[in-house]
Amino acid sequence: MSSHADSKPWTVPALAQAKREGRKLVMLTAYDAGFARTFDANGVDLILVGDSLGMVVQGHDSTLPVTTADMVYHTASVARALDRALLVADLSFQADATPERALDAATQLLQAGAEMVKIEGAGHKLEVIRYLVEREIPVCSHLGLTPQSVLRFGGYKVQGRGEAGEQLRRDAQAVVDAGASLLVLECVPTPIATQISAELSVPTIGIGAGPGCDGQVLVMHDMLGLDSGHRRPKFVKDFLAEGGSVAGAVRAYAQAVRDGSFPDAEHAYAA
């Protein structure tokens, strides 16, 4: 279990404290109360209600069809089950197109029980991040492979190799300067993700970004080895096979993140 007291709910300042103390953060996605309750009781520090629900719950080929109403419904379902994990919810595709639209969507998510909202990308999103933070809404940034940009990327590909790694470093610092309290790095080569994590004052959460991040996140279906109807990424590991039950799988995943055994080189990308 986490060294963060079991009875003490996670807060945004506690995340930064964990980074300063070198304690790895454990994050999983959840979309309903039943799984969220199990994750919360078995060592997960942060729950992400991701727009990945479009693929693993609704059966779409991407996250693009997910709406703010979808996100609010699933966020409220998860929030009712949590005692200690901090709840992060995605802003859906184009909900953050303007600061005003982002504020409306973020307000709905916080009213549904989220404690932080996640925004993909940098660039014009920096204005959105600043706008929300100035209005007391905590923000998690998401860089690297950002699924809402899948059409521009031409598929789900590793990001940040070569010269693109330097731009990723600049973007990471920029989102923190704009006020982000947490940063998800997805499908980023281990060396650049490790460097970014060392340079930033806020925690980084990796998904396919190697062991040098300050924590890890997986889509719950991937962590449990469930067939989501999509190709399994390299960084995915089936913890249900060794855990023997859903609760056991969650504990095995949490322990592996905390002791540094996951992800290993087999579940990460080289430079």
Swiss-Prot record:
Main localization of the protein described in the UniProt heading: cytoplasm
Family: Belongs to the PanB family.
Pfam families the UniProt entry points to: Pantoate_transf
Top class in the EC scheme: transferase
GO cellular component: cytoplasm
Positions annotated to bind Mg(2+): D51, D90, E120
Protein name, as recorded: 3-methyl-2-oxobutanoate hydroxymethyltransferase
Subcellular location: Cytoplasm
Enzyme Commission identifier(s): 2.1.2.11
Co-factor(s): Mg(2+)
Organism: Xanthomonas axonopodis pv. citri (strain 306)
Annotated residues for binding of 3-methyl-2-oxobutanoate: D51, S52, D90, K118
HAMAP family: PanB
Subunit structure, as described in the record: Homodecamer; pentamer of dimers.
